[in-house]
Amino acid sequence: MKKAGMVLEGGGTRGVFTAGVLDYFMEQGMYLPYVIGVSAGACNAVDYASHQPGRMKLCTIDFLEAGSYVGLKSLVKTHSLFNMDLIFDIFPNKIIPFDYDTYFSSGMECILTATNALTGKAEYLSEKSDRQRLMTICRASSSLPVVSPIVDVDGIPMVDGGVADSVPIRKALHDGVKKPVIILTRQAGYRKAPAKKTLKMAQIMYQKYPNLIRAIKYRAYYYNRTMELIEDLENRGHVFVIRPQVPVVKNTENHAEVLTDFYNHGYEYAKDIFEQAASFAGWEGEK
């Protein structure tokens, strides 16, 4: 079988769509040997590699009211739009345990994408033994510029991987993935507009990091180029793309009912396209 793998876009709480898709895939036992994720996609990636269907839903939806992990309340309390300590420490280590043992013993290659604030380039990171470093990488991958603190990984300041590489299909292809299954959190045809307000704030906050400012400035351009590449590969049958078929939620959506509907859409849509996705990936069922 040609090497197959998952490529997971981020998108804040839009990641519940991806969680719904992956939960159905995991229930069917479809674990591909490679997964790469960005931001919320990185969070989904580690739960996929640890074989924990339902965990992302628990963290993102079921504990939403109790955790108050997203929104202005979190920004005031923790100086981050998302409560990073809750998501990457309290949840995985106390409330909704992350299965580190299964993750570390898994033969799955799991790559997490962050943006190096010094270079403005993507860093593709992995960890197979150190629990704290794994969660620090996930935190860095999800640390949105301006509204979340910069995170140090191995002494290097990093922010959200989506700044430098929102959908790392090129990295997957470079790693030898011949059958990429890409899960996007935007509808077909979406193109990103320049984030002018974010750029203005970044120019004030990140004067020490000119390459990060440049990456933020050109993020929309590179994102749209990546969408063009994915659409071209899709049209030629070289990738299998899964994307929402209904209007998407905002990346800071914090209403449990809205998120549940979007999660359920991902889960039900996965049912509809499962045989096609499995056939494309060359997956023939659990051995």
Language-model regions: role of each:
Residues 1-38, 46-287:
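Patatin-like phospholipase
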